[in-house]
């Protein structure tokens, strides 16, 4: 582990011990995480004794599910589940890849559009016996409502988020929400409690609470972790980008000389 990764590990240990986090999240979807990034992240998560949740690229992303299995993910989230058919496809793909082991996993869907809300009860019915958690994605949900990101903490988004959460709870599912979670989202988080079981930043999944001090401290620490994660990722790819530059320059010079020798 390098120095940045050690700092990341220290923050995760503090987040777990003080701020009651559950898991670290990665994405094959919007974030587009690559396997080498996930391997590096997974080592830190393992040392912190936390779970890894991964959002796959779609309801039937079998290759992503294979990668999740290899990485030992504890929870898998499917994005943009907008119909009972999409839910059915997710169930089928999960059972195909995990076979009998699917029962040992936490299966999560993203409820993140007005279309999903419209079809929610049918989706939740289709997920019976398989689905564990409904995670509400506020960024896409607000966009699908025709609202700007500035309105993500407003009453319209809160009302729809609460309705989705209530219906999910009626079916016995756990409820999580995220998207645009920063200090200014604290009043929204407090209003949702205790209807939700969890909330999440881009990378960190927390147990639900309405304690303002815990929320502020936890969100700031999550932001520190995410900043270091991005720094480590950038430095890793910067090293890869420059490691062959000296040889590339030498080969270009040799080629130029060799080419000039061919000129008659």
Which stretches of residues belong to each language-model region?
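Expand to "…catalyze enediolate/carbanion chemistry for C-C bond making/breaking, isomerization
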Residues: 1-264
């Amino acid at each position: 582990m390098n120095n940045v990764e050690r700092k990341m590990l220290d923050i995760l240990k503090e987040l777990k011990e003080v701020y009651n986090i559950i898991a670290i999240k990665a994405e094959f979807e919007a974030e587009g995480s690559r396997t080498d990034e996930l391997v590096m992240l997974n080592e830190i998560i393992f040392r912190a004794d936390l779970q890894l949740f991964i959002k796959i690229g779609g309801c039937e992303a079998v290759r992503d599910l294979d990668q999740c299995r290899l990485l030992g993910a504890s929870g898998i989230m499917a994005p943009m589940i907008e119909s009972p058919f999409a839910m059915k496809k997710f169930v089928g793909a999960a059972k195909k890849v995990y076979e009998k082991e699917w029962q040992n996993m936490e299966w999560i869907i993203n409820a993140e559009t007005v279309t999903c809300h419209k079809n929610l009860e049918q989706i939740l019915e289709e997920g019976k016996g398989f689905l564990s958690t409904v995670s509400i994605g506020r960024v896409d949900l607000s966009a699908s409502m025709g609202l700007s990101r500035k309105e993500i903490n407003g009453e319209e988004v809160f009302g729809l988020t609460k309705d989705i959460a209530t219906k999910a709870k009626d079916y016995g599912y756990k409820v999580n929400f995220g998207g645009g979670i920063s200090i200014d989202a604290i009043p929204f988080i407090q209003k949702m409690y205790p209807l939700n079981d969890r909330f999440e930043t881009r990378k960190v999944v927390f147990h639900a609470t309405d304690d303002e001090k815990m929320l502020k401290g936890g969100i700031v620490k999550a932001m520190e972790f995410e900043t270091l994660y991005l720094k480590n990722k950038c430095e890793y790819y910067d090293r890869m980008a420059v490691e062959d530059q000296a040889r590339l320059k030498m080969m270009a010079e040799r080629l130029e000389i060799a080419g000039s020798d061919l000129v008659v």
